[in-house]
Amino acid sequence: MEGHKSGMEAVAVAIPPLHTGESNHRIDSNVSSQCHADPAELSDETQQQSLWHLGLRKIIPSSVPLLKKVSAEFFGTFILIFTVLSTIIMDEQHKSIETLLGIATSAGLAVTVLVLSLIHISGCHLNPAISIAMAVFGHLPSAHLLPYISSQILGAVAASFAVKGLYHPVNPGIVTVPNVGTVEAFFVEFIITFFLLFIITALATDPNAVKELIAVAVGATVMMNILVAGPSTGASMNPARTIGAAIATGRYTQIWVYLVATPLGAIAGTGAYVAIKL
């Protein structure tokens, strides 16, 4: 029962934040000059860059102070984890009223609204695995990685203790614990995190992607992954989600699986799309 309930878990998102305000001015200048130029005079490469910049203007944060970015990551992670854990607890307390589909929907909707709300501030990672992958491929300054991860973990821990205080005693089902063998659990978490980052990277970096649908696509991917992997591993995809619930309940069963498999899956998913991108 515990393994099944923990299967309705959380996730995260991410769009690479812009590094400097100067870069924003360059983008605006380039887009402005190219928009007034005769399309026939633009090379294919220039048109491609123009399309890319026009798409990015709506989703890449401008130069935002690091304090505001990490604050957005803290509050966003808190909202996400609080929503997911509360939904799981309601399902347990009311005889599976939510069901796996309901919990997956709750997590997917939470991710969707948070991406729409925070993407322009921090990129809305809410997940150390995403931040690590973004840093590895140069989309997040290395100096920002530790502050991002710290704020995400603190947000998840705070949300887990808030849930524990409100619904005490908390059922251990909120903890992500494998309901399959260790090797199987490792690869399940690796694969679903791979899926998540493959989609995020495609939408965030491909000029041909429909950028207005990023929030919906990422939320739908989270929902899909929970439906696929929830009953077997808890479908964490997010080290912060796993750490927060583990600390709040004092249960650390096979926690290393989630701390190792998810970052590796995130890096692999991002790398896979980078390799095939046109």
From Swiss-Prot:
UniProt cross-references to InterPro entries, sorted A to Z: Aquaporin-like, Aquaporin_transptr, MIP, MIP_CS
Record key words, sorted: Membrane, Repeat, Transmembrane, Transmembrane helix, Transport
GO cellular component: membrane
Tissue expression: Expressed in leaves and at lower levels in roots and anthers.
Transmembrane feature ranges: 70-90, 99-119, 141-163, 185-205, 213-233, 255-275
Pfam families: MIP (PF00230)
Positions occupied by motif NPA 1: 127-129
Primary site of residence: membrane
Example GO molecular function: channel activity
Functional summary from the UniProt entry: Aquaporins facilitate the transport of water and small neutral solutes across cell membranes.
Keyword Membrane: yes
Membrane topology note: Multi-pass membrane protein
Similarity-based family: Belongs to the MIP/aquaporin (TC 1.A.8) family. NIP (TC 1.A.8.12) subfamily.
Name of protein: Aquaporin NIP3-3
Motif (NPA 2): 238-240
Subcellular location as annotated: Membrane
Gene: NIP3-3
Comment block on domains: Aquaporins contain two tandem repeats each containing three membrane-spanning domains and a pore-forming loop with the signature motif Asn-Pro-Ala (NPA).
